Amino acid sequence: MTSPHFSSYDEGPLDVSMAATNLENQLHSAQKNLLFLQREHASTLKGLHSEIRRLQQHCTDLTYELTVKSSEQTGDGTSKSSELKKRCEELEAQLKVKENENAELLKELEQKNAMITVLENTIKEREKKYLEELKAKSHKLTLLSSELEQRASTIAYLTSQLHAAKKKLMSSSGTSDASPSGSPVLASYKPAPPKDKLPETPRRRMKKSLSAPLHPEFEEVYRFGAESRKLLLREPVDAMPDPTPFLLARESAEVHLIKERPLVIPPIASDRSGEQHSPAREKPHKAHVGVAHRIHHATPPQAQPEVKTLAVDQVNGGKVVRKHSGTDRTV
């Protein structure tokens, strides 16, 4: 075969024959390639058709199996659905019961909260009233404490005046040369509260333990009234001052006064000396009238026990009456 495109070439018969040969070879190879492609396409189509038929058969088998199984399990499915319905109904009933219980508990909680609110208000009112009562009682206690302090100072002053009057009576009687009025120390001595701390005694320890506060902000104050009722006050109050320092002299002053005073205080003259004898006159041992405090004297080994007398003598109509007591008391 010759192509019409090569009709224009007139170089020579060799070139034309070579071109024709090349074209024929190319055409032959193209035909072979096309035939190969056609065969491959046919084989591919054949394989696809066989695969489609296999899948169709498998699908048919699965459909048959599903139909058979569904027909067999129809009865079991109805029983299971009924059981599930019953179970659901039971759970719903339990849920309703729990909801009712929850509602009841909420109501009870509201009631409890209301009661708590009422009780809190009541407690606040009572606490306010109680605090007001405590303030009033604390004020009253403060007034009583100040009155007690005034009375203690008055007692100390009256005691000093009483002993001054007694010294004047003793000096005017002239019954003895060793009268204590002759001593300038006794004449100028007046009871005064001690500047230093008094020695610790069981009585002071008991007072301190009773007046000690149980809390830094509150202290317990027990007071018994005329009706023997115990009142408990819990409010910061000042402790009642101890009147003992106003009634007792210091130990250092006692030691100093012992050196200045005579060891024997003679009895005071009385109009009734002829009627009865005083134990102080009958016994020549060392006797001492306490001036609101204790003064201890050194006694000889053979001396009899001292007679302790009351701290304050009674002056009635210019006569001195001395009272004896078994114990030493302070005014």
Curated annotation (Swiss-Prot):
GO terms for molecular function: identical protein binding. Keywords: Antiviral protein, Coiled coil, Cytoplasm, Cytoskeleton, Host-virus interaction, Immunity, Innate immunity, Phosphoprotein. Residues 193-203 have a biased composition (Basic and acidic residues). GO terms for cellular component: centriole; centrosome; cytoplasm; intracellular membrane-bounded organelle; nucleoplasm. Its main location: cytoplasm. It is found in: Cytoplasm, Cytoskeleton, Microtubule organizing center, Centrosome, Centriole; Cytoplasm. GO terms for biological process: innate immune response; regulation of defense response to virus. Residues 18-44, 76-152 form a coiled coil. Phosphorylated at Ser-209 by TTBK2. InterPro entries: CCDC74A/CCDC74B/CCDC92, CCDC92/74_N. Residues 171-212 are annotated as: Disordered. It comes from the Eukaryota. The keyword Coiled coil applies. Induction: Up to threefold after interferon treatment. It holds the Pfam family CCDC92. Residues 171-184 have a biased composition (Low complexity). The modification Phosphoserine is found at residue 209. Interacts with CEP164. (Microbial infection) Interacts with ebolavirus protein NP; this interaction sequesters NP in the cytoplasm. Interferon-stimulated protein that plays a role in innate immunity. Strongly inhibits ebolavirus transcription and replication. Forms a complex with viral RNA-bound nucleocapsid NP and thereby prevents the transport of NP to the cell surface. This is Coiled-coil domain-containing protein 92. It comes from Homo sapiens (Human).
